[in-house]
Amino acid sequence: MKPYQRQFIEFALNKQVLKFGEFTLKSGRQSPYFFNAGLFNTGRDLALLGRFYAEALVDSGVDFDLLFGPAYKGIPIATTTAVALAEHHERDVPYCFNRKEAKDHGEGGNLVGSPLQGRVMLVDDVITAGTAIRESMEIIQANGATLAGVMISLDRQERGRGELSAIQEVERDYGCQVIAIITLNDLIAYLAEKPEMANHLAAVEAYRQQYGV
């Protein structure tokens, strides 16, 4: 685990974005942990979040021309990541996001920001079912751009309805790499370093055993 990944876990714990306990997911599964990126909700949170996304993007080595943030959660993430790339990595990358509703005046259309072209890095919080990715792919392809990769905060590394995770399905269907700041394996490695979290470690490992990929 790299230092920025450990720092991200601590950041998520401090903001109660990452919690341990008993949680019922939309899938109906009982999960021993829960991740709610919506609780990164202050200016400082967003500034730090952008730095973690930028760090993981640069670390991945994936080549891209533009950041795309799908409405709505992806919009602030794309914005803060673009700022962090410029401020901390000397990479001035254009960004773009979509509107849910098309507009018939002003800029018009359903895209805001730079023209959607070239190799696109899609940034979002998490991938649960992959539905948002499919919707974004339609927009990207309609504009003649290509998907370079997908960047998220957490890869839960768990099976969907079949044998693959939602992330593995996205990688298979679109031939792109999904980059995550942290994965479930990173989370388990972090818990293993903390004796006071031994009970959470056992629960998360049991969950991985049952649902992991």
Curated annotation (Swiss-Prot):
Keywords linked to the UniProt accession: Glycosyltransferase, Magnesium, Pyrimidine biosynthesis, Transferase
Binding of 5-phospho-alpha-D-ribose 1-diphosphate, residues: 26, 72-73, 99-100, 103, 105, 124-132
Names of the cofactor(s): Mg(2+)
Recorded catalytic activity of this chain's protein: orotidine 5'-phosphate + diphosphate = orotate + 5-phospho-alpha-D-ribose 1-diphosphate
Annotated orotate binding sites: 34-35, 128, 156
EC number of this enzyme: 2.4.2.10
Gene Ontology MF terms in the entry: magnesium ion binding; orotate phosphoribosyltransferase activity
Biological pathway: Pyrimidine metabolism; UMP biosynthesis via de novo pathway; UMP from orotate: step 1/2
GO BP, one annotated term: 'de novo' UMP biosynthetic process
Listed GO CC annotations: cytoplasm
UniProt-listed Pfam families: Pribosyltran (PF00156)
Family the entry assigns: Belongs to the purine/pyrimidine phosphoribosyltransferase family. PyrE subfamily.
Quaternary structure, from the entry: Homodimer.
NCBIfam families: pyrE
Role summary: Catalyzes the transfer of a ribosyl phosphate group from 5-phosphoribose 1-diphosphate to orotate, leading to the formation of orotidine monophosphate (OMP).
Name this protein carries in UniProt: Orotate phosphoribosyltransferase
Organism of origin: Cronobacter sakazakii (strain ATCC BAA-894) (Enterobacter sakazakii)
